[in-house]
Each structure stands twice: as C-alpha cells, then as structure tokens.
From Swiss-Prot:
Family, similarity comment: Belongs to the peptidase A8 family.
Enzyme class: hydrolase
Keyword Signal: no
Domain of life: Bacteria
One of the record's GO molecular function terms: aspartic-type endopeptidase activity
Protein name according to UniProt: Lipoprotein signal peptidase
Protein task: This protein specifically catalyzes the removal of signal peptides from prolipoproteins.
Compartments (UniProt record): Cell membrane
Length: 155
C-alpha cells in the first residue's frame, strides 16, 4: 500500500504543477528561476521524449496501459520484498499515470521544467518525466545490486 501512496503523491504533484502552468501561463511563456540556467516554460508535447512520435496518441494509450499493468504486476509480486524495487516501481507508476492523464484529457503532455546549459537547451519536461527517470535509475541500481548478490552467492 505504501508504494501506491508514493505513486499517488507523484501523480498529484504532477497534475497540480501542470494545472498551475496551464492556468497561469500562455503557451510559450517563460519565466527565469535561475537566469541563464533554469526557467519555467509553458510547453506542450503531443509525442514522447524529445517530441518523437508526435500525434500518435493511440500508440501511447496502448503502450502506457501495458506498462502500467506490468508495473502493477511487478509491484504486487516483488515490490513488497524489496524496498528499493518498490520505490522504483512506484515512481515509475506515478510518472506513467501522470503523463497518461494528460494524453487522455488534453491529447498532449504539459511540460514546463526548462534547463539551459550554455547554448544547449535540454528538452522541457515535467514532474511525471522526472518521476519516471528517477524510478528507472533506482531500478538499474536494484538490478546491479541483485546481480552483485547473485555473483556473490555463486562464488
């Protein structure tokens, strides 16, 4: 249950921040938080990461539902045994559902976190994207730890 609370909190944070952006900013508006480095920029994305597969909503609906089902399955089957895995899956679940809500109700995803590194503008993202990425990183760490345990037990 704890892991579903983490996912729920991430969904709420994601949807609240997106609602604030849509309500208070025009598309394309940008406000510096740390001038020259971090901006809040109102942006929309009808595709996936970095704007790939623009407008392919049916594809994202199917893939996201399959991913959500897989995450819930693994969370139920393995998440309770391993805290790091549970947190990783919860963050991934929250991120997947957060962006899925946008795709279903807006047919696009609201993005706003905009980082600039010199002349390079990192693709604009949101809380759900961050939740997914942190979850995937934690999942990789868990996999490395599991691999190390397996290697130690066989030697």
């Amino acid at each position: 249950m704890f892991y579903y609370i983490i996912a729920f909190v991430m969904i709420c944070l994601d949807q609240l921040t997106k609602w604030l952006i849509v309500k208070n900013m025009m598309l394309g508006d940008s406000y510096p938080v740390i001038d020259g480095f971090f901006y809040i920029t109102s942006h929309r994305n009808s595709g996936a990461a970095w704007g790939i597969l623009q407008g392919q909503m049916w594809f994202f609906y199917v893939i996201t539902l399959v991913v959500i089902a897989g995450i819930v399955y693994y969370l139920q089957k393995h998440g309770q045994k391993d805290k790091l895995l549970g947190v990783a899956l919860a963050l991934m679940l929250g991120g997947a559902i957060g962006n899925f809500i946008d795709r279903v109700f807006r047919q696009e995803v609201v993005d706003f976190a905009h980082f600039v590194f010199g002349n390079y503008h990192y693709p604009i993202f949101n809380i759900a994207d961050s939740s997914l990425c942190v979850g995937v990183i934690l999942l990789f760490i868990q996999m490395l730890l599991d691999g190390k345990k397996t290697k130690e037990s066989t030697t």
